[in-house]
């Protein structure tokens, strides 16, 4: 009996497995159909909504938090370097949390100022520790030796309390705080009288003249490009050839700090127009790459928004940048500034030679206050024809009279 029951159970189990197999196949097919339908529907769905921009009130609250954090840094600057204090780690964590909320350049500046305050505070504390000054223990020992009550011998207990002569200490310090601050304002006269306003004279009104229509000026000629536009064109052509360059190599001009700033302005305008993309790699280096500028219709519709970047650069940073960038790897060329007074030196040389040949020197008497009657030679230029025969040159004839 047991064998027959087992065989029947095995037979029924095999039938159940055979019945379950087509059901599993059907469920797998349905899941595949659902996935294909979902993939076909995804392109038609609208893109996920982007993060809404921060409001004015949120940005104001963020800047106020940065301001309170800077005040806290200035207040507890003495406790940042203590071993048993956790203020440094707490402030750094607070700055990092606020940095995650920064979206605009104004808040980026506040974030950079907070980090700069922390760095300056740590540097000043390190300098104060390295300097050889009076420690608090030495100051207290000097007070006890000068104004302490009781004998300070070798046999005295270290745990014994020492009292000070506060009256003598006050008299000693009194000379430095004798000056009291009073009222430094000045009161005006008490008998002020009301001044009568002078009556302004009436001006005669002139009748308007006849209307005149100005001549229209032909604006067909294209406007000349400014220096900034030329720098932008040169920089974009360099980026088009190199495709990916470091920011320092693109901006730096080793010979001129002013031209480095001009290159930085040109890069900022290219980034604003969407023609340059600035990225940061894992090591923290900045790279610039060219991009195609968006169409005007896309900008007007609001799909594309102009962005700016903040770059702090002073003379010390320029010196450091010139040391970091290897010599000869600067990409922007040096621009020569033209000076009007030094132009055409070769053309002015023969003219000056002709002028010296045609001039005559005549003694002229002048009366000087310090030396009396003085004889001074002056040049008198007369009208002479041109030697080359191209025409006559007009030269002024100067007459000098003596009093």
Swiss-Prot record:
Keyword set, alphabetical order: DNA damage, DNA recombination, DNA repair, Nucleus
Tissue specificity note: Expressed in seedlings, rosette leaves and floral buds.
Main location, first listed in the record: nucleus
Keyword DNA repair: yes
The keyword NAD is annotated on this UniProt entry: no
Basic residues composition-biased segments: 196-206, 394-403
Compositionally biased tracts (Basic and acidic residues): 1-45, 384-393
Region of interest (Disordered), residue spans: 1-57, 194-226, 342-403
Pfam families for the chain: Nse4_C
Location relative to the cell: Nucleus
Biased composition (Low complexity): 342-353
Comp. bias intervals (Polar residues): 354-363
Superkingdom field: Eukaryota
GO biological process per UniProt: DNA recombination; DNA repair
A cellular component annotation (GO) from this entry: euchromatin
Subunit details: Interacts with SMC5, SMC6A or SMC6B. The SMC5-SMC6 complex is composed of the SMC5 and SMC6 heterodimer attached via their hinge domain and from the non-SMC subunit NSE4A or NSE4B.
Function: Component of the SMC5-SMC6 complex, that promotes sister chromatid alignment after DNA damage and facilitates double-stranded DNA breaks (DSBs) repair via homologous recombination between sister chromatids.
Family to which the UniProt record says this protein belongs: Belongs to the NSE4 family.
Stated name of the protein: Non-structural maintenance of chromosomes element 4 homolog A
Native species: Arabidopsis thaliana
């Amino acid at each position: 009996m047991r064998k027959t029951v087992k065989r029947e159970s095995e037979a029924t189990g095999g039938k159940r497995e055979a019945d379950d197999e087509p059901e599993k196949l059907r469920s797998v097919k349905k899941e595949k159909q659902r996935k294909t339908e979902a993939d076909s529907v995804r392109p038609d769905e609208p893109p996920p909504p982007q993060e809404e921009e921060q409001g004015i009130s949120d940005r104001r609250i963020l800047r106020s938090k940065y301001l309170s954090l800077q005040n806290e840094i200035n207040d507890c600057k003495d406790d940042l370097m203590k071993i048993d204090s956790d203020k440094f780690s707490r402030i750094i964590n607070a700055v990092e949390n606020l940095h995650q909320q920064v979206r605009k350049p104004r808040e980026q500046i506040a974030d950079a100022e907070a980090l700069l305050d922390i760095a300056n505070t740590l540097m000043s504390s390190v300098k104060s520790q390295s300097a050889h000054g009076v420690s608090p223990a030495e100051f207290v020992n000097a007070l006890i030796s000068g104004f302490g009550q009781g004998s300070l011998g070798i046999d005295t207990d270290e745990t014994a309390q020492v009292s000070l002569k506060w009256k003598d200490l006050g008299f000693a310090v009194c000379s430095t705080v004798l000056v009291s601050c009073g009222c430094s304002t000045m009161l005006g006269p008490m008998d002020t009288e009301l001044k009568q306003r002078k009556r302004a004279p009436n001006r005669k009104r002139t009748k308007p003249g006849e209307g005149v229509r100005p001549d229209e000026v032909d604006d067909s000629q294209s406007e000349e490009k400014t220096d900034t536009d030329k720098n932008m064109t040169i920089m974009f052509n360099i980026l088009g050839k190199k495709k990916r360059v470091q920011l320092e190599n693109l901006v730096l001009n080793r010979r001129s700090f002013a031209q480095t700033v001009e290159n930085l302005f040109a890069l900022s305008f290219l980034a604003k127009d969407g023609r340059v993309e600035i990225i940061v790699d894992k090591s923290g280096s900045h790279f610039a790459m060219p991009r195609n500028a968006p169409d005007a219709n896309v900008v007007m519709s609001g799909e594309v928004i102009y962005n700016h970047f903040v770059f702090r650069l002073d003379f010390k940073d320029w010196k450091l940048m010139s040391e970091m960038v290897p010599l000869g790897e600067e990409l922007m060329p040096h621009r020569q500034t033209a000076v009007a007074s030094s132009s055409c030196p070769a053309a002015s040389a023969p003219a000056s030679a002709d002028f010296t040949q045609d001039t005559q020197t005549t003694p002229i008497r002048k009366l000087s206050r310090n030396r009396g009657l003085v004889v001074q030679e002056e040049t008198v230029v007369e009208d002479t024809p041109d030697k080359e025969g191209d025409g006559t040159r007009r030269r002024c004839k100067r007459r000098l009279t003596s009093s």
